[in-house]
Curated annotation (Swiss-Prot):
Annotated protein name in UniProt: Calcium-transporting ATPase type 2C member 1
Annotated membrane topology: Multi-pass membrane protein
Enzyme Commission number: 7.2.2.10
Gene transcribed to yield this protein: Atp2c1
KW Protein biosynthesis (keyword) present: no
First-listed, main subcellular location of the protein, grouped into a coarse class: Golgi
Main function: ATP-driven pump that supplies the Golgi apparatus with Ca(2+) and Mn(2+) ions, both essential cofactors for processing and trafficking of newly synthesized proteins in the secretory pathway. Within a catalytic cycle, acquires Ca(2+) or Mn(2+) ions on the cytoplasmic side of the membrane and delivers them to the lumenal side. The transfer of ions across the membrane is coupled to ATP hydrolysis and is associated with a transient phosphorylation that shifts the pump conformation from inward-facing to outward-facing state.
Annotated source species: Rattus norvegicus (Rat)
SUPFAM superfamilies: Calcium ATPase, transduction domain A, Calcium ATPase, transmembrane domain M, HAD-like, Metal cation-transporting ATPase, ATP-binding domain N
UniProt binding sites for Mg(2+): D644, D648
GO molecular function annotation: ATP binding; ATP hydrolysis activity; calcium ion binding; manganese ion binding; P-type calcium transporter activity; P-type manganese transporter activity
Keyword Translocase: yes
Length: 919
């Protein structure tokens, strides 16, 4: 006899050995062997002393969450951002150079950014403690011969646990008693159909398939039907549920594309800043200037070139995106996640509960005499109709249909109360059908005399009943189950009220109809009735399906059209998976489907080569999903994973963005996810992708504005310094320009409304820097116009070679007006300001008006004139400056027009793009 594999832990006090059995091994052993190995008493349970001893070694039946780091450490960790570190260095240098105004402004900017990021992370990132919510707070346990209520966390290996309908299994159990037990394991395995449980030893499948362990009740699963007793074999992290937990802890979440872009931008800015320092120092040294003086000037210029407002605008832009997503019933747990969806090009979606409702529904009826009926409505309720040849059938109006409904209703243990199912989903679908026909009261009209419960071996259920008002008549037998099994007990079939002999021709006809319904993704049940099991009359077939969610097909179509590939990953059969995928538009003639077993045999390298053409993965487990996602990421794809069950949790965390269902999603799933869809609406993902693309565009708009302004200011001061010109701007004027650069006008660019055309554009490549060649060109063009225009005004005013307050006021105001027009043209990289609407962004309008009012106060308000060393300008001066500075906006509009014309020409000349599956 094989020796059980288990871990032996010595008990110090009584020198006994406490074993730890895996569910795979326990399922192969007889109950007596398991009890012997666990030193357990199945009937009387453990005594309290033994429970204490075992808990000392096994711990509590809960998950070991590592202690969270202190808040101060979390706060300090925010400073590790490259841009923040660069700003800190700038602030320190400013203090050393006694430029306290810059030092204060930079320090305040740092504190704002860090605090906002810290608060957001603190509120949104919960620890994995939410996992414990899946474990019920109480359970029924036998100890010292008594049945008692105890906390689930108190259980230890060897405890005897009692289960009944509605209970959530508190630990992994080896069942030793089971009466018509059916457990919903969809949250763990992805299988929609509840698993029938037995007590006999079951050889475990070689691939470790949990569904093959039919004598094991797994932690976190739900008892749908029957009752049972089991012995605890695994608690906490030693359970199968705990394995998922450990996989989650081991998986590190990848950096988001925005984080990568910001890191790259920080490095680029550092490189450019130090490059400027080196060049200015070298040129100054060659010109014979004092090296220390040149170093001071160079560092000042480098500090001025760093856009310290960038982290603030990025944070604010993302936060506003999160707020907009909340209004659309989506909770984003981390700020950069919304933007990540903007470059997502693959969505891996679980079928059950995500693309479908996880509510079995009858959609088609075939009577034994060939009559077809369509059933409308979805879910466990009375809303819907049964339609035959265009007419609505109700009650006993159509006997052929009514008899099928009657059999399905009477041969049934499920109950629907307040639209909530208590029982098996398949039986719930039949009760809902009866409710639509007004026949659900038939269950109470019959008295059940005998019952033949459903089992996975026989694949049918039957009952013997008598009508309450006709108890003196012979018993009637009703049967439902798989067609291949039910037909064996049938000798006749119903044809327009007459009972006719069941011929081979009729059997072949029913077989064809059954196959046709199955190919459409329907689960087919046959129903029959008669005086005895061997003398049944076939009544007909019903087709049941887990229907797609409302609006999913439309969302899928839009996403595919925008260049996003969608792959369905499910534990269902190939036939069902392909049928659902076809209905949703995910599966075409050129698509491929791959099983979980095939995924097992492939290396990630091989899988990454075929995965672009695969639309459906069936019979997939959590480890398969992980492998699929890794293969997609190996191809450079940005992967989003949607799901609602425990089986999705690891993949949700491994994906670039995990999306959980809020209503049907398990707590472990929600904690692993980056975004939660409150209403389980798949369409919200499309809105999130649109939001993500819009957010990235807004960030690019801000970067364009701020860098062009920074470069212009840097170039202006550098030229004046190198050419021994008087400084065209004084310190306070430069500070005011910096406030405008990083203040309301700049930040209002981050709240620009999302362009409705953005969803039609393909996902961007996450490898691309935020500073693309096109953006750099636009930045340089704007900078050159600003520098040339400002120098022209300075040269025009400085004809006597004596600098006066008027000279600096004209130059200063010219630069500020250039800033305002530059901000206006930066609102969109592709559309004209008139096309997007001058007042479509009210915050921008208020910010620009406020800045102009502030500039006028600086020019005309005497106290501020002294501070900024300015003087009043005439109306002609202002009109001249407005005309000159508007050139930066006019040139930008011309560039946009040229780009749109070129893009339109390219679209007309290029061929049709390849299939969306070629990701």
């Amino acid at each position: 006899m094989k020796v059980a594999r288990f871990q032996k832990i010595p008990n110090v006090e009584n020198e006994t050995m406490i074993p730890v059995l895996t569910s795979k091994r326990a399922s192969e052993l007889a109950v007596s062997e398991v009890a012997g190995l666990l030193q357990a008493d199945l009937q009387n349970g453990l005594n309290k002393s033994e429970v204490s001893h075992r808990r000392a070694f096994h711990g509590w039946n809960e998950f070991d969450i590592s202690e969270d780091e202190p808040l101060w450490k979390k706060y300090i960790s925010q400073f590790k951002n490259p841009l923040i570190m660069l700003l800190l260095a700038s602030a320190v240098i400013s203090v050393l150079m006694r430029q306290f105004d810059d030092a204060v402004s930079i320090t305040v900017a740092i504190l704002i950014v860090v605090t906002v990021a810290f608060v957001q992370e603190y509120r949104s990132e919960k620890s994995l403690e939410e996992l414990s919510k899946l474990v019920p707070p109480e359970c029924h346990c036998v100890r010292e011969g008594k049945l008692e209520h105890t906390l689930a966390r108190d259980l230890v290996p060897g405890d005897t646990v009692c289960l009944s309908v509605g209970d959530r299994v508190p630990a992994d159990l080896r069942l030793f008693e089971a009466v018509d037990l059916s457990i919903d394991e969809s949250s763990l395995t992805g299988e929609t159909t509840p698993c029938s449980k037995v007590t006999a030893p079951q050889p475990a499948a070689t691939n470790g398939d949990l569904a093959s362990r039919s004598n094991i009740a797994f932690m976190g699963t739900l008892v749908r039907c029957g009752k049972a007793k089991g012995i605890v074999i695994g608690t906490g992290e030693n359970s199968e549920f705990g394995e998922v937990f450990k996989m989650m802890q081991a998986e590190e979440a990848p950096k988001t594309p925005l984080q990568k872009s910001m890191d790259l931008l920080g490095k680029q800015l550092s490189f450019y800043s130090f490059g400027i320092i080196g060049i200015i120092m070298l040129v100054g040294w060659l010109l014979g200037k004092d090296i220390l003086e040149m170093f001071t000037i160079s560092v000042s210029l480098a500090v001025a070139a760093i856009p310290e407002g960038l982290p603030i605008v990025v944070t604010v832009t993302l936060a506003l995106g999160v707020m907009r997503m909340v209004k659309k019933r989506a909770i984003v747990k981390k700020l950069p996640i919304v933007e990540t969806l903007g470059c997502c090009n693959v969505i891996c979606s679980d079928k059950t509960g995500t693309l479908t409702k996880n509510e079995m529904t009858v959609t088609h009826i075939l009577t034994s005499d060939g009559l077809h009926a369509e059933v409308t409505g979805v879910g466990y309720n009375q809303f819907g109709e049964v339609i035959v040849d265009g007419d609505v059938v109700h009650g006993f109006y159509n006997p052929a249909v009514s008899r099928i409904v009657e059999a399905g209703c009477v041969c049934n243990d499920a109950v629907i109360r307040n639209n909530t199912l208590m029982g098996k989903p398949t039986e719930g679908a039949l009760i809902a059908l009866a409710m639509k026909m007004g026949l659900d009261g038939l269950q109470q009209d019959y008295i059940r005399k005998a019952e033949y419960p459903f089992s996975s071996e026989q694949k049918w259920m039957a009952v013997k009943c008598v009508h309450r008002t006709q108890q003196d008549r012979p018993e009637i037998c009703f049967m439902k189950g798989a067609y291949e099994q039910v037909i064996k007990y049938c000798t006749t079939y119903n044809s327009k009220g007459q009972t006719l002999a069941l011929t081979q021709q009729q059997r072949d006809l029913y077989q064809q109809e059954k196959a046709q319904m199955g190919s459409a993704g329907l689960r087919v049940l046959a129903l029959a009735s008669g005086p005895d099991l061997g003398q049944l009359t076939l009544l007909g077939l019903v087709g049941i399906i887990d229907p797609p969610r409302t609006g999913v097909k439309e969302a899928v179509t839009t996403l595919i059209a925008s260049g996003v590939s969608i792959k369905m990953i499910t534990g269902d059969s190939q036939e069902t998976a392909i049928a659902i995928a076809s209905r949703l538009g995910l599966y075409s003639k050129t698509s491929q489907s791959v099983s979980g077993e095939e995924v097992d045999t492939m290396e990630v390298q091989h899988l990454s080569q075929i995965v672009p053409k695969v639309a459906v993965f069936y019979r997939a487990s959590p480890r398969h999903k992980m492998k699929i996602i890794k293969s997609l990421q190996k191809n450079g794809s940005v992967v989003a994973m949607t799901g609602d069950g425990v089986n999705d949790a690891v993949a949700l965390k491994a994906a670039d963005i995990g999306v959980a269902m809020g209503q049907t999603g398990t707590d472990v799933c929600k904690e692993a996810a980056d975004m939660i869809l409150v209403d389980d609406d798949f369409q919200t993902i499309m809105s999130a992708i649109e939001e993500g693309k819009g957010i990235y565009n807004n960030i690019k708009n801000f970067v364009r504005f701020q860098l062009s302004t920074s470069i212009a200011a840097l170039t202006l001061i550098s030229l004046a310094t190198l050419m021994n010109f008087p400084n065209p701007l004084n310190a306070m004027q430069i500070l005011w320009i910096n406030i405008i650069m990083d203040g309301p006008p700049a930040q209002s660019l981050g709240v620009e409304p999302v362009d409705k055309d953005v969803i039609r554009k393909p996902p961007r490549n996450w490898k691309d820097s935020i500073l693309t060649k096109n953006l750099i060109l636009k930045i340089l063009v704007s900078s050159i116009i600003i520098v040339c225009g400002t120098l022209f005004v300075f040269w025009r005013e400085l004809r006597d070679n004596v600098i006066t307050p008027r000279d600096t006021t004209m130059t200063f105001t010219c630069f500020v007006f250039f800033d305002m027009f530059n901000a206006l043209s930066s609102r969109s990289q592709t559309k004209s300001v008139f096309e997007i609407g001058l007042c479509s962004n009210k915050m921008f309008c208020y910010a620009v008006l406020g800045s102009i009012m502030g500039q006028l106060l600086v020019i005309y308000f005497p106290p501020l004139q002294k501070v900024f060393q300015t003087e009043s300008l005439s109306i002609l001066d202002l009109l001249f400056l407005l005309g000159l500075t508007s050139s930066v906006c006019i040139v930008s509009e011309i560039i946009k027009k040229v780009e749109r014309s070129r893009e339109k020409t390219q679209k007309n000349t290029t061929s049709t793009p390849s299939s969306f599956l070629e990701v």
